[in-house]
Amino acid sequence: MSASSRGAALLRSQQRSICLQCRNQTRVLAPAGVTSAPRRFYSAEASATATATATATTTTTLPPPHPPVTTSTGTHAATSTSSQIYRIKSGVILTRPPLLTRDLTPFEESFYFYQKRLNERLTAPFRKDFYFKKDTAADLDWRIKLKERHGVPAKDIGRYNPRGRMAWNDEVLVGSQTSSRKHMVEKLLADAEMRVSEDGEEIPAEDRVPVEKPMPRRTEADEKGDVKRLDRALDKTLYLVVKKKADKEGEEAKWMFPTGVVPTDEGLHETAARILAESAGVNMNTWIVGRVPVAHHVVRPVFGQKDGALLKKGEKIFFLKGRIMAGQADLTDNLHDLVDFKWLTQEELRSTLAEEYFHSVKGMFAER
């Protein structure tokens, strides 16, 4: 008998849980006239290990069989499957992107102002003869304004001469308004006024044509706090939220994104587009960005405390992102019992939406 056969026979003989058929088969497979070699342990350690192995083998019992599957309604897991206790819903997070760049920080204003002064030091001197014909109205107007700027061609860098002996001192002092946006706009508007008429005569201050000023960054809606208008918070993203009135089951009125149940014959993006039209009307030019959800919210089902019966189904809501390009929301004749709507910024959503609801969707919000 080979070494491998003797080892296999040794292991089988030590296992008492082996059936008699396998034991007899092992004995029959042994060649006639060949007796099993006596056990030889080459060290005391090997002998102790074999004894411990044999003891552990004899005391090992087989695991019990799997318990039968029951249909009892006593536990939540056995009550229903996930598809029976949850409703699949689709929602749309309709956004209006920022229309203006954000306000600069004081550090950024100082940095850009420093770059303007540095540029005046490094560039070639301004050649007015190339732009203004001598003794014309434009040339006279340029001379008047250049004198008011103390000989500095640039209009928005303050009293700074990049060619003088103090050209190295190109940083503004702390607290100075020279680098502020408001100060620069005032200087540029004042310089844009024409001081000389076509006849070469200086125009009095009361007869000068005022330059049209740019629109303010804060609109009338910002001043009044009107959260239903789209022309507010122009430097931030706005999100459409709607308020659903309290239902008969005792659920309180709450703010949320337009949401509805997904039927079996629609995809998530199709349901989102339909729900938006049914909730906020069709007087909006909107666009659903892609067919993949950008956020996910789960509402747990409600079970009875005594018998574990399902009292209220849960919800799994998948949100898709949308853009509005024109129009306005209109809740008239909506099909989802909505009573109000708002266009809110990310900071305003935090205080309006429920905490868990906001936590589920905050990952898709834009930076501003």
From Swiss-Prot:
UniProt-recorded Gene Ontology molecular function terms: structural constituent of ribosome
Highest taxon, organism lineage: Eukaryota
Xref: Pfam families: MRP-L46 (PF11788), NUDIX (PF00293)
Biased composition (Low complexity): 69-81
Entries under CDD domains matching the protein: NUDIX_MRP_L46 (cd04661)
Location(s) in or outside the cell: Mitochondrion
Region (Disordered): 53-81
Any one GO cellular component localisation term in the record: mitochondrial large ribosomal subunit
Ribosomal protein as UniProt keyword: yes
Primary localization: mitochondrion
Keyword Transcription in annotation: no
Family annotation (Gene3D superfamilies): Nucleoside Triphosphate Pyrophosphohydrolase
Keywords: Mitochondrion, Ribonucleoprotein, Ribosomal protein, Transit peptide
InterPro entries, alphabetized: NUDIX_hydrolase-like_dom_sf, NUDIX_hydrolase_dom, Ribosomal_mL46, Ribosomal_mL46_N, Ribosomal_mL46_NUDIX
Role noted for this protein: Component of the mitochondrial ribosome (mitoribosome), a dedicated translation machinery responsible for the synthesis of mitochondrial genome-encoded proteins, including at least some of the essential transmembrane subunits of the mitochondrial respiratory chain. The mitoribosomes are attached to the mitochondrial inner membrane and translation products are cotranslationally integrated into the membrane.
Entry's family note: Belongs to the mitochondrion-specific ribosomal protein mL46 family.
Assembly and interaction partners: Component of the mitochondrial large ribosomal subunit (mt-LSU). Mature N.crassa 74S mitochondrial ribosomes consist of a small (37S) and a large (54S) subunit. The 37S small subunit contains a 16S ribosomal RNA (16S mt-rRNA) and 32 different proteins. The 54S large subunit contains a 23S rRNA (23S mt-rRNA) and 42 different proteins.
Name of protein: Large ribosomal subunit protein mL46
Gene: mrpl17
